[in-house]
């Protein structure tokens, strides 16, 4: 780990006047459907299974959505994964229709990579605070001020922001890609998550200008409270997503993407884990490691209250009813301008090609041969 990271400024881009508002969050929570009873859930799942077969469709779900949807995806030959795994699965699957259970940028990414396919979502209003906090016009203006820098954006962005970028990354491959770019002597603009950008900057020593976005879920984890919880459970392994603040990341025994955290929970011999990410991941952790204990990391400080309480309200908007509606009506379809999609595909495909190269072992990642 390199601790002498170089940045042009501490935090470079002042927070623009479009932070995710409490009103937007309340509106999202208001749209979250009640959990159906067992009989209703079973009926909906049977109907959706028939519709998926009829429409030659496949369900692609994120780890953070309702466990009922995660299970349905696996039962029907679909995918449950992080955003990189979802993108790769959708691009490689032969289905005519992709039903993406996640947030809007995930549906857009699927459409960018598979413009010939129909991409449906349970709810088109399922947004992401990182996407909302990085409007294309403001981000492009920031990039225009630094034309000598390579633009790297997190996957949690709109198609328009991706089209402005040179590279798209997910948390699964961000460190490797930034290390590779640093080895080439490139200076970077990073957006939109400031915590992930700061973590990558400290780990790689890359010269990065950081946009000031954050995830409403991970931004709420508290280092002081996590330290106290860790003291109560000294035998617990702390799993931290790098969208969390530095004070939280520094307490992590494992820091990484949802897939990396899941793998650690399953493969490590310890029996107790403190989890600092969206608690939707606990469903798969408990399925794959039923003999282990998982404890939620604290999200609010003393006397404080949480906005998300470690659950993304937009992820929670995905429902079995929404999936059925999308498949029966053909609505909630992701539509993108062709030229915009083509421009956004270049940096997104660059990431997928790089990740494939890492798996083959033929990409130099800046830290030695992969």
UniProtKB/Swiss-Prot annotation:
Residue ranges of the TM segments: none
Cofactor info, note text: Binds 1 [4Fe-4S] cluster per subunit.
Pfam family, one: NadA
Stretches assigned to coiled coil: none
Co-factor(s): [4Fe-4S] cluster
Cellular localization per UniProt: Cytoplasm
Keyword line: 4Fe-4S, Cytoplasm, Iron, Iron-sulfur, Metal-binding, Pyridine nucleotide biosynthesis, Transferase
A GO CC term attached to the entry: cytosol
Molecular function per GO: 4 iron, 4 sulfur cluster binding; metal ion binding; quinolinate synthetase A activity
Binding site for iminosuccinate: 62, 83, 154-156, 171, 241-243, 258
Example of a GO biological process term: 'de novo' NAD biosynthetic process from L-aspartate
Binding site for [4Fe-4S] cluster: 128, 215, 312
Pathway listed: Cofactor biosynthesis; NAD(+) biosynthesis; quinolinate from iminoaspartate: step 1/1
Catalysed reaction, written as an equation: iminosuccinate + dihydroxyacetone phosphate = quinolinate + phosphate + 2 H2O + H(+)
Keyword Transferase included in the entry's annotation: yes
Enzyme Commission number(s) from the entry: 2.5.1.72
Keyword Membrane: no
Family statement drawn from the similarity comment of this UniProt entry: Belongs to the quinolinate synthase family. Type 1 subfamily.
Alphabetized PANTHER family for the sequence: QUINOLINATE SYNTHASE, CHLOROPLASTIC, QUINOLINATE SYNTHETASE A
UniProt function note: Catalyzes the condensation of iminoaspartate with dihydroxyacetone phosphate to form quinolinate.
Protein name according to UniProt: Quinolinate synthase
Protein species of origin: Neisseria meningitidis serogroup C / serotype 2a (strain ATCC 700532 / DSM 15464 / FAM18)
């Amino acid at each position: 780990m390199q601790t002498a990271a170089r940045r042009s400024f501490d935090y470079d881009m002042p927070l623009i006047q479009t932070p995710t508002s409490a009103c937007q969050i309340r509106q999202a929570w208001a749209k979250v459907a009640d959990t159906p009873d067992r009989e209703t859930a079973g009926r909906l799942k049977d109907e959706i299974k028939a519709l998926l077969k009829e429409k030659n469709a496949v369900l692609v779900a994120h780890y953070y959505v309702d466990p009922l949807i995660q299970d349905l995806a696996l039962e029907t030959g679909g995918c449950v994964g992080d955003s990189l795994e979802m993108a790769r699965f959708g691009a490689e699957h032969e289905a005519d229709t992709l039903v993406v259970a996640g947030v809007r940028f995930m549906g857009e990414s699927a459409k960018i990579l598979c413009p010939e396919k129909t991409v449906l979502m349970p709810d088109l209003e399922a947004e992401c605070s990182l996407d909302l906090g990085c409007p294309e016009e403001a981000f492009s203006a920031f990039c225009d001020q630094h034309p000598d820098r390579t633009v790297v954006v997190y996957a949690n962005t709109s198609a328009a922001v991706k089209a402005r970028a040179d590279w798209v990354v997910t948390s699964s491959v961000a460190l490797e890609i930034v290390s590779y770019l640093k080895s080439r002597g490139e200076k970077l603009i990073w957006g939109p998550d400031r915590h992930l950008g700061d973590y990558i900057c400290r780990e790689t020593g890359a010269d990065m200008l950081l946009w000031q976005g954050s995830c409403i879920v991970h931004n709420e984890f508290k280092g002081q409270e996590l330290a106290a919880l860790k003291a109560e459970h000294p035998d617990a392994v702390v799993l931290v997503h790098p969208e969390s603040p530095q004070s939280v990341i520094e307490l992590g025994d494992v820091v990484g993407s949802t897939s990396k955290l899941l793998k650690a929970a399953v493969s490590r011999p310890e029996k107790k884990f403190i989890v600092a990410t969206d608690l939707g991941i606990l469903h798969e952790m408990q399925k794959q490691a039923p003999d282990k204990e998982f404890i939620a990391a604290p999200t609010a400080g003393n006397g404080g209250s949480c906005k998300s309480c470690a659950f993304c309200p937009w992820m929670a908007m995905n429902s079995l009813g929404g999936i059925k509606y999308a498949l029966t009506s053909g609505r909630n379809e992701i539509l993108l301008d062709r030229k915009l999609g083509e421009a956004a595909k270049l940096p997104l495909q660059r990431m997928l090609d790089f990740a494939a190269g890492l798996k083959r072992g033929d990409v130099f990642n800046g830290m030695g041969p992969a």
